[in-house]
Amino acid sequence: MQQLTRQTKVVATVSPASSLQTIADTIKAGMNVACINFSHGSYDDLAQTIAQIRSIAGELDTPVTLLQELQSSELPSLSNKDVRDVEFGLSQEVDYIALGFIKSAEDVRVLKNLLQQKGAADTAVVAKIEKHDAIANLEEILDECDAVMIAPSDFGVGMSQEKLPLLQQRIIALCNHKGIPVISAVQVPESTTHKHSTRADTSDITKAIMDGTDAIMLASQSEVKEISVKGVQMLVQIATETEAEIEFLNNPPAKTDVTHALSVGLNAICKVLPPRCIATFTSSGYTARLAAGERPKVPIIALTPNPKVYRSLNLIWGVQPVLLNREVETFEELTAQVEEILRDRSWVEPGDKIIIMAGIPTKHSQGTNFLKIHTIAGNRE
């Protein structure tokens, strides 16, 4: 049976300098999100890189999320170049757009208004927290953005080093409570392999995972060379080993509604059974994100008919997205479809218990209103 173990996602930078083989090796090593830095490269080169990532991901039958990182500037935070880059990124159907030098929620709104004007309001905005003003205005920024990227090395200038770990912990905790995905950039030396990483490197990565980050990102990587493949392998190994030894905190629901109540119930069920996995049906990704916010010990299989949601969910902690080629309407069809998908991918065995979370009826539901404990048919050999 194929194992589904790692829950923390890995982000790495891919550039036009990256070869096809290196991109393939990086995806195989465990890269979930490819960050494309728009400070470098022509549009033709960047388009080719994006096409290569998509092609290889398709061949490997694995989702890879595309994160466009704008060059950004301090004044204004969204420059004329950034506007052109956003338009190009939208033409390439990027999944997330990261904006730097954010000082207030207004900076996020400027980008969101641009996306609205371009008919791309569903494209997620990542707020890079790297300025003291952003830290001071953190809550209002979180109310506007769709995800957060933090890099202690960036906002560490002028701040006492002993405060940085607690600041990172506070930001991650607030994001977890609000249900906002958070990426933690970690410094990894260019010569890093798992055997030669320093204790400080490993400790920083482990702490970010224990704090509850959704993803860890290889910082200061302008190109994906062989060393980035080794860096991804290191992050995957540290994440897998850390997750096996800790119990994540369950975050209290940010809202009091049916969907939030069901997501809270997941943890109680998981601790008693536990199930093999949680299967969620989602058209927007909302249900899967709520389930992930509870930090269950078992993987979340997010089934969606929407290719954009399929890719974007690959950033979310603990979520394994699956793209559906057909939609179902009845409860019986839904259950049968879950079994078929999980069996085909060798994620379950006969007799395994799973949790199904969805909105019934599937095509007309106004939200998640259904949770079922289901036993996979058949007998164990």
Where are these regions (language model features)?
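Non-catalytic helical/linker scaffolds that mediate oligomerization, partner binding
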Residues: 1-381
